């Protein structure tokens, strides 16, 4: 290896290390703002897949009770009293290809769990889809900060 090629390798390594983590990652890890802008979900690796937990609500206090929002649409009485902030939304979300996962997602708006797929659509874009029967609906989440 000549001195010049050694220098080039060192420069390339320095540039790779200097690339911001946000650009390097391109994965699902991070905090995501839902399409409606009413919640933020922290997505992180867990087990062999990914987990998603609600970390912020636009309206964290229920105006009817003056208390933190709870999972009151859940048909299971034991679960209907749990707070929305801290609620785990993903179940069994496992890799399903490059930048894709499939499993189940919980929708606190209706208290139901749906078959789901999640795909990284860009460094700051996550496509989240839920299906019941043959009907699917989805939304785009945007990477954000706490």
Task: List PLM regions with ranges.
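Residue-level recognition of beta-strand termini and adjacent short loop/turns
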Residues: 97, 122-124
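Sec/Tat signal peptide C-region and signal peptidase I cleavage site
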Residues: 19-25
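Structural motif
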Residues: 46, 121-122
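Short, exposed beta-strand-loop hairpins at the edges of beta-sheets
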Residues: 108-110, 115-118, 125-139
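Bacterial N-terminal signal peptides
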Residues: 9-18
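Bacterial N-terminal signal peptides that target proteins for export
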Residues: 1-10
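K/E-rich alpha-helical interaction surfaces of small helical-bundle regulatory domains
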Residues: 26-40, 139-146
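Central antiparallel beta-sheet cores of small beta-barrel/beta-sandwich binding domains
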Residues: 29, 35-109, 113-116
């Amino acid at each position: 290896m000549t001195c010049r090629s050694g220098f080039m390798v060192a420069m390339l390594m320095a540039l790779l290390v200097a690339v911001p983590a946000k650009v390097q990652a391109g994965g699902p890890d991070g905090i995501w703002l839902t399409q409606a802008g009413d919640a933020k979900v922290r997505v992180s690796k867990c087990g062999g897949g990914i987990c998603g937990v609600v970390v912020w609500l636009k309206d964290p206090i229920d105006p009817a009770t003056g208390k933190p929002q709870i999972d009151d649409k859940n048909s299971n009485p034991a679960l209907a009293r749990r707070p929305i902030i801290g609620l785990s939304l993903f179940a069994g979300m496992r890799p399903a290809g490059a930048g894709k996962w499939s499993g189940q997602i919980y929708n606190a708006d209706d208290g139901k769990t749906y078959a789901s797929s999640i795909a990284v659509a860009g460094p700051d874009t996550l496509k989240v889809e839920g299906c019941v029967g043959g009907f699917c609906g989805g939304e785009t989440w945007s990477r954000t900060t706490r």
